[in-house]
A protein has these predicted regions:
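Conserved pre-ATP/AMP-binding loop-to-beta segment of ANL
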Residues: 67-88, 95, 118-124
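Conserved AMP-binding/adenylation subdomain of ANL enzymes
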Residues: 107-124, 132-172
Length: 173
């Protein structure tokens, strides 16, 4: 997995995709213009899947492609030392820098978050995006570790946060 910063320009997206040797790109409506700008450079190297309502002509429709897929988990053996994800720095001093994380590191992060927040299966965690950054995602891992509910916040205003906490009965924010 290689989550990308929603603020990246087309050139930064192109740079990160090539550096990570990406085979498949999933993107939503907010990325259409920036992905379209680099299609001539990337379309021969990777599959492009659009996740949204109106799929652009240069991509495949994710929902249509997955409509008849099996719900069975794929039989893929994963070792703790296998590479799991590449996260990128913000790129404030130039192009983003890649940080490679292994499964062991992500599993340990999930365990530590669950311990830190004393998360139980009955908790409800409010996950505040953006998810391209390890900060929000690593906090979310504690609820994944315990099998508790997580709510992905839509918006970032105080009102949206209070509304989500109230309506979803969030116990960890």
């Amino acid at each position: 997995a290689v989550p990308l910063n929603f603020r990246y320009t087309s050139d930064e997206i192109d740079y990160c995709l090539k550096l990570a040797d990406v085979d498949v790109l999933f993107f939503g409506p907010e990325f259409i213009g920036r992905v379209e700008a680099i299609v001539p450079k990337i379309s021969q190297q990777m599959l492009l899947f659009f996740v949204g309502d109106t799929c652009p002509s240069f991509a495949e429709d994710y929902h249509r492609a997955t409509a008849n897929c099996s719900s069975m988990a794929p039989k893929v053996l994963i070792d703790d030392e296998d590479e799991a994800a590449i996260y990128y720095s913000s790129g404030t001093t130039g192009f983003p820098k890649a940080i490679l994380l292994k499964h062991h590191a992500l599993a340990q992060s999930a365990r530590m978050e669950a311990i830190h927040h004393a998360t139980t299966h009955n908790d409800v965690f409010l996950c505040i995006p953006p998810l391209y950054h390890t900060g929000a995602k690593m906090h979310w891992f504690g609820s994944l570790f315990t099998g508790s509910k997580a709510v992905l916040l839509k918006g970032n205003s105080p009102q949206a946060i209070f509304q989500a906490v109230s309506s979803e009965r969030c116990s960890i924010v």
